[in-house]
Amino acid sequence: MKTLKHKILATAVMLMAVSACGKESNSGSVTGPALSASPLELVLESAASSQEVNVTAPSKPNFVSSASDWCTVTAGAFAQKSVIKVNVTENQSAEERKASVSIVCGDERVRLSVTQKGREVTPEQPEDFLAEIEPGTNNAWTVAKKLGLGWNLGNQLDAQNNGVASETAWGNATATQATFDGLKAKGITAVRIPVTWLGHIGAAPEYKIDDAWMNRVAEVVGYAEKAGLMAIVNIHHDGADSKYWLSVKRAASSSAEYQAITAEFKAVWKQIAEKFADKGDFLIFEPFNELHDGSWGWGDNMTDGGAQYRVVNQWAQEFVNVVRATGGNNASRYLGIPGYCTNPDLTIENLVLPKDSAEGKLLVAVHCYDPHDYTLEAKYDEWGHAAVNNPAPSDEKPVVEVMRKLKTKYIDNGIPVYFGECGCVNRSTSRQTSFQKYYLEFFFRACRNYGIAPFLWDNGAMDTGRETSGFINHSTGEYIANGAQIIPALKNAMFNTEKSYTLKSVYDNAPR
């Protein structure tokens, strides 16, 4: 019996000596080489990466990470001398983070120290977004300079009542040559002439535009030409909220709808292009206005797999094809191409510029009323870093960021950009008006800084508050409301070349 006990004890000791690292001998040691690792201290960059570690062990060890959510170990087949990988995910924080990896074999333990650097962040200086940008020399900068200070003849030829466009339907008197001469005298250099064609388009398949309306549009364009102004003509409220014939929502819903609407769209643009084929390069065509499904970029376009975006891009291509095919000066005319809803972000993300037989003759058209609760709805009284009383929740930086993104995407690549609409409604007190003036001067100076041509929205409204954006009388060309304060400030913002006058100087002189 005693001999049997000795044999059992000897066998047990032998088994313990060759067992896995997780089992200890009576003396607490294991057979084979001692557990070791190199290096013991790991320092990794903020990006997701791996680092190799050489491990020597008598048998397969266990690995325990103190931060397994971002620091893990990859180990292959065991060998007494092997290589493992310590893996880290991206550290999106600016702060470094630390973890430890324990390598355990029996009662032996080696600890690896893991440090991952934080994401490198360039400290933002308060004046960085106000820095002066050296004007470029490419086509984008050249065209923006040519357009200069723009203005909209809004709520005029785009006005409509019960589905019929009428120049005086929304309260403005008939435009005259004096209107455009007055604009020129005040420093305006370009005019956007929105045109609604509702009620003036005949039946399929010709879709003939009635002569009286077409001739009136041509007459107003002639006013701009005679005054020496650049001009933009478009199809405006025909696509408003997808309520009328130029409905992006219906066109995206079926092939039949798309084909029917596109046929009318092409027919209308063929007639417009032919009417103005002999006009010089002062005239720019813009295919449509703010096309969306009625939800201003927050509707079905977010879930339809890009169907509405594709329609907008396809219509832009059809527009270019039709205009170029009419010949004359249209073969090389500048054409403005809006993205979905004319929203800058949606345009950057989804606009596909049409193929064009004329090189460098396409402009990108976007609108910007940021923040709209201040500029259009008048829910806030003041805006910017100096605002105190009922201030808008966003300030100058987001506005500049919009322009920076447009510059990076388009202007730096030689593609001109213009804000077909921008502005800020009139206010009722002198202090509120001073912030309105500051917003507009800052916005327009930023446009000049980033090489973007801005067109002020003017709807002729002389009251104050929501949607009241009258600065110049649409019939006489004289100032109305506080236009005598606003327009000279915008002229200064766009054309002042004194070194002391900068975006930062405008910022520093905000109302207090």
Residue ranges and their predicted role:
Residues A34-L35, A57-K85:
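Surface-exposed binding patches on compact interaction domains or structured appendages
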Residues T429-R512:
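Aromatic-rich peripheral "rim/lid" segments of glycoside hydrolase catalytic domains that contact
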Residues L153-A175, A203-I209, E257, D373-P398:
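Acidic/histidine-rich helix-loop elements
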Residues V121-A190:
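N-terminal carbohydrate-binding accessory modules
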Residues H6, V13-E41, C105-G106, R111-F129:
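Bacterial Sec-dependent N-terminal signal peptides
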Residues Q259, A263-D395, R404-C424, N449-I452:
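Active-site region of glycoside hydrolase catalytic domains
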